[in-house]
Amino acid sequence: AFLTLTPGSHVDSYVEA
């Protein structure tokens, strides 16, 4: 995703998953 620097993070997760 674009919100966090760690792909698969809980913040990144809602936008990718």
UniProtKB/Swiss-Prot annotation:
It comes from the Eukaryota. The keyword Disulfide bond does not apply. This is Peptide hormone 3. GO terms for cellular component: extracellular region. The keyword Glycoprotein does not apply. Keywords: Neuropeptide. One of its GO terms (biological process) is neuropeptide signaling pathway. InterPro entries: Pea-VEAacid. Pfam families: Pea-VEAacid. GO terms for molecular function: neuropeptide hormone activity.
